[in-house]
Amino acid sequence: MITIKKGLDLPIAGKPAQVIHSGNAVNQVAILGEEYVGMRPSMKVREGDVVKKGQVLFEDKKNPGVIFTAPASGTITAINRGEKRVLQSVVINVEGDEKITFAKYSTEQLNTLSSEQVKQNLIESGLWTALRTRPFSKVPSIESEASSIFVNAMDTNPLAADPSVVLKEYSQDFTNGLTVLSRLFPSKPLHLCKAGDSNIPTTDLENLQIHDFTGVHPAGLVGTHIHFIDPVGIQKTVWHINYQDVIAVGKLFTTGELYSERVISLAGPQVKQPRLVRTIIGANLSQLTQNELSAGKNRVISGSVLCGQIAKDSHDYLGRYALQVSVIAEGNEKEFFGWIMPQANKYSVTRTVLGHFSKKLFNFTTSENGGERAMVPIGSYERVMPLDILPTLLLRDLIVGDTDGAQELGCLELDEEDLALCSFVCPGKYEYGSILRQVLDKIEKEG
């Protein structure tokens, strides 16, 4: 078992009851183009087209053969683009239950599948996009290979769902999915990472390796798992996938149908009844959260409060990789002499306010509690960074765009979510996730 001691479990109010409920019905879903790093779409549909579930919507020009399919049947009502015609979202009004079917196999056949059979079914169904690489966090090329594949069956993000609750209901589909993934590269490890005290279903596979992690966040991030088990570099790549996509893989290969249901955490200080709800990938979050939120100006986030995406306008949908929806209040109010008050209702990792000494949960808002200023190395980053890197030096190199120095200090192992805690504790209010992405893009382009 690997124990993570450095990090932070955010004491935020609105923790979800770990019981699965039916969520609000949604009649609109979307694929969010900006979730896929570096993707340039070649559209196969236009507004007004009627599509079936599993039908191709677009293909990645930069990654030929990688296709993106409809999570539900219906009519294409909008193809939203931003600056420089960047694809923001492809919106579908859900109608009917028309679907495209794919190859299916019996449970006994799964362990005899060839790598090519697995790859072909994943690509044709669009489930290939559930896989992501490290470094760079991109959908892998269909011709590439990985040193190993990581399955993340734990989640330490604030307000997250407990994977064991979800997997208890889908244990057979999950083990079927593991079997399928083990056939993708039969001679290479398939790493299943789980919480040490969790009851996660497993199966007896030759290349399956099970790893237990415990401790504070980011113990549940795949970047942490990769760092301690099979570190990556410029010449070495691993792939990873989350546990609910493994369920989808299992269902695809045994039913021949694309499975796009999600069990997510709907939680946060502004949610009336924080709980786990069933919904669909790409669900319209305004519809999903209708009558679920407290009054006032709220920020709905697809993903974690630490590193999720703001859900509004053309991005008002559940992300492809998001397993939670978090809701906090907009912190627009100015405080009179806030900087000299005891602030018993605020939290600080540096113990500068009285709230730090209480054991209560806090109603966090979007307020940064200060403006941007110079980066101040006071040991905050080291407290929350469990990886074997020098965070202050790495963050400095990221800020100034020193790609050589950043590579030497380990930036290729990281994704935006791995630096979310550094952003949270930063006295200078830097957003290190977006800075990291700029550096990674430059490294990939220029070397």
Curated annotation (Swiss-Prot):
Keywords per UniProt = Ion transport, NAD, Sodium, Sodium transport, Translocase, Transport, Ubiquinone
InterPro entries in UniProt: NqrA, NQRA_2nd, NqrA_C_domain, NQRA_N
Pfam families the UniProt entry points to: NQRA_2nd (PF24836), NQRA_N (PF05896), NQRA_SLBB (PF11973)
Does the record bear NAD in its keywords? Answer: yes
In its UniProt record, which GO terms are filed under biological process? sodium ion transport
What catalytic activity does the UniProt entry give for this protein?
Answer: a ubiquinone + n Na(+)(in) + NADH + H(+) = a ubiquinol + n Na(+)(out) + NAD(+)
Q: TM segments?
A: none
Kindly list the GO molecular function terms attached to this UniProt entry: oxidoreductase activity, acting on NAD(P)H, quinone or similar compound as acceptor
Q: What is its EC number?
A: 7.2.1.1
Q: Does the keyword Ion transport apply?
A: yes
| Biological role | NQR complex catalyzes the reduction of ubiquinone-1 to ubiquinol by two successive reactions, coupled with the transport of Na(+) ions from the cytoplasm to the periplasm. NqrA to NqrE are probably involved in the second step, the conversion of ubisemiquinone to ubiquinol.
Q: Which family does it belong to?
A: Belongs to the NqrA family.
Q: How does it assemble?
A: Composed of six subunits; NqrA, NqrB, NqrC, NqrD, NqrE and NqrF.
The entry's protein name is Na(+)-translocating NADH-quinone reductase subunit A
Gene name, please? nqrA
